[in-house]
């Protein structure tokens, strides 16, 4: 049975293990379900640009962090 590498598995043996682990943590935070600060709905928030987040339900748009909305 092989290792479970997750989202960073696409890099294979390249770039070093510590860089891949840090990148994996950041990307997992980015793609998890986030809650809208306006309508409090979870799972409808998407990133439309670096630091710009949008709620598909209520249409709210706000500036957040690069990989997380708050």
Curated annotation (Swiss-Prot):
NCBIfam families: PRK03976.1 (NF003058). This is Large ribosomal subunit protein eL43. Keywords: Metal-binding, Ribonucleoprotein, Ribosomal protein, RNA-binding, rRNA-binding, Zinc, Zinc-finger. Its cofactor is Zn(2+). The keyword Cell membrane does not apply. A zinc finger (C4-type) spans 36-58. Belongs to the eukaryotic ribosomal protein eL43 family. Putative zinc-binding subfamily. GO terms for molecular function: large ribosomal subunit rRNA binding; structural constituent of ribosome; zinc ion binding. Part of the 50S ribosomal subunit. GO terms for cellular component: ribonucleoprotein complex; ribosome. InterPro entries: Ribosomal_eL37/eL43, Ribosomal_eL43, Ribosomal_protein_eL43, Ribosomal_zn-bd. Zn(2+) binds at residues 36, 39, 55, 58. Binds to the 23S rRNA. Binds 1 zinc ion per subunit. PANTHER family: 60S RIBOSOMAL PROTEIN L37A (PTHR48129), LARGE RIBOSOMAL SUBUNIT PROTEIN EL43 (PTHR48129:SF1). GO terms for biological process: translation.
